[in-house]
From Swiss-Prot:
Pfam families xref list: HHH_5 (PF14520), RuvA_C (PF07499), RuvA_N (PF01330)
Protein name per Swiss-Prot or TrEMBL: Holliday junction branch migration complex subunit RuvA
Assembly and oligomerization: Homotetramer. Forms an RuvA(8)-RuvB(12)-Holliday junction (HJ) complex. HJ DNA is sandwiched between 2 RuvA tetramers; dsDNA enters through RuvA and exits via RuvB. An RuvB hexamer assembles on each DNA strand where it exits the tetramer. Each RuvB hexamer is contacted by two RuvA subunits (via domain III) on 2 adjacent RuvB subunits; this complex drives branch migration. In the full resolvosome a probable DNA-RuvA(4)-RuvB(12)-RuvC(2) complex forms which resolves the HJ.
The organism of origin for this protein: Dehalococcoides mccartyi (strain CBDB1)
Gene responsible for this protein: ruvA
Transmembrane annotation, as ranges: none
Amino acid sequence: MISSLNGILEASGKDWAVINVSGVGFRCYMPATSPALIGGLGQRVRVFTHLHVREDALSLFGFATTEELSLFETLIDVSGIGPKLGLAMLSVMNAEALASAIISGNAELLSTIPGIGKKTSSRIILELKDKIAKNWEAGVLSQVTEANSDILATLTALGYSSSEAAKAISSLGDNGDLPLEERIKLALNYFNNK
């Protein structure tokens, strides 16, 4: 129904923003990182939205990118994952890190998200692994082994794209015997030496 909003950012909080579109202020629930990404107060912004309809409420969820929106809509298709939990997942991990954790089958990483236990993380992986792999940079992410999926998640959480992170991981060679912290340092050195 409402696929995007284009207007002036009037107010924002930790997980919401009010966008004024032609004199009407729309309150959107957003991942915790999104209000800072879309722009500053008083600036023209564009937010991609999902309208969630319940019998007692209409809730608008906004995202900085279409990728975030697509992942959110895919997540809430899983039984037991509602919009609030889907939003919480995208607040803890950015869309690329979350997608790579699901594609690589990293249930431990997913279960670190508040509200997601081992059973739920396993169900998410089972139901969404193939679906998300089709929609995301599956070619790049498939080069990342399960042993290096934590490095991929860390680098994407630091703001690197999944393709940049995959290049850094491929530069590591066979260092699987090193502790995770050392492999992350080596991957970060890849960006310092560029």
